[in-house]
Amino acid sequence: MKLSISRRIVRWPALAALVACAAIVVPNVNGQTTQTVTVTSTVPGVLSLGIDTNAVSIPFLAGDYSPSTGLATKVVAGANTLAVTSNKSWTVNLKANTAAFSFVPSAGDPDPAKPAGNFSYKVSTAGAYTAITTSNVVVKTGSKGGTATAGNTFIMDYQLTSNLAQDPPGTYTLAIIYTLTAP
């Protein structure tokens, strides 16, 4: 019996030595290493003004004029739709390019220098019309976002007055300028 006990005692130290050697020789498979990656992106300033048409006609007919005063007023509701895309808060300004309409006479009349202020505008959802000037006037302000952002798409109404005593027959043209800024 002593023989079998001594064999067991000899086997355990040999097994312990074998495990110790394996720990030294076998690499640690449970190790871990990390690396950090920095992602960089540059976002440009986005500022875009779209308009549905660059030409609006406001023709007067003989029946538009008051027989007693000779005055006429024409309104074009929904004359222009403007759409803003911006990643900053924005402002749209409006002004006339010149102080008077250009004039091409129908019958050789002299240029009456029809004032630009005979043309008025308003945002469709606003109250009264405002006579245009040659100075930038704030028409609308809005929030950053696309054209689907509330308030970033809006409609403009136009109004033009005429007076038989001052406006000879012909074609009157006025350039109006919308300017989008992001302060």
What do the predicted segments below correspond to?
Residues 117-128:
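Short beta-strand segments and strand-loop junctions that repeat across beta-rich extracellular domains
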Residues 17-19, 29:
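Cleavable N-terminal signal peptides
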Residues 2-16:
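Bacterial N-terminal signal peptides that target proteins for export
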